Regions:
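Mobile ATP-lid/nucleotide-binding loop of the nucleotide-binding subdomain
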Residues: 14-15
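GHKL-type ATPase core
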Residues: 1-7, 18-144
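GHKL/Bergerat-fold ATPase module
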Residues: 157, 164-169
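Core mixed alpha/beta domains of very large multi-subunit molecular machines
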Residues: 1, 150-159
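Short basic (Lys/Arg) and small-residue
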Residues: 11
């Protein structure tokens, strides 16, 4: 905890405080180097954070980028992961219409880059949910963009490096 704040609150309210907490992790990250979620929060009228971790569900709500109350343990869960729901602020955005296809394309790319995790997009207006999960990561991405094209090689050449500190093995 920093300044009597949970790590989640620090990440939500401080630039460059992303979930990696060190520069080395960003060598293999598909994120925005610790500014993404704090900027979303800063530009939102309301934001809800739900964290599923170690068998517990934690909740914190924000209004105009400020926490309404501290992070609270809110029951048990068998899930893992984080859910962010937000409403952009009309102070910063004139048009609050989302380009769903653009958002879905970016989430799909993130799912390829972060193989083995599920990323979900829910359209609250239509109720339609889209999930992205790719165990094969970049291999699946290459196979998808090749679609019906002729491969140069029968099998895709792929190296999955192990990164430890500043060293790649």
């Amino acid at each position: 905890k920093a300044e009597n704040k949970s790590a989640a609150e620090v990440i939500m309210t401080t630039l460059h405080a992303g979930g990696k907490f060190d520069d080395d992790s960003y060598k293999v990250s598909g994120g925005l180097h610790g500014v993404g979620v704090s900027v979303v929060n800063a530009l939102s009228e309301r934001l809800s954070l739900t964290v599923h971790k170690d068998g517990f569900k934690y909740q914190q709500d924000y209004k105009d980028s400020h926490p309404i109350k501290p992070l609270e343990k809110n029951g048990n869960t068998d899930q893992t992961g984080t859910v962010i729901q937000f409403l952009p602020s009309t102070k910063y955005f004139k048009d609050l219409n989302y380009k769903e296809d653009v958002i879905k394309k970016r989430l799909k790319e993130l799912a390829f880059l972060n193989s083995g995790i599920t990323i979900k997009f829910t359209n609250d207006v239509s109720g339609k949910e889209t999930s992205y999960y790719y165990e094969g990561g970049l291999r699946e991405y290459i196979n998808e963009i090749l679609n019906n094209k002729k491969d140069i090689h029968d099998n895709l050449i792929y190296i999955d490096p192990i990164v430890k500190g500043n060293n790649t093995i």
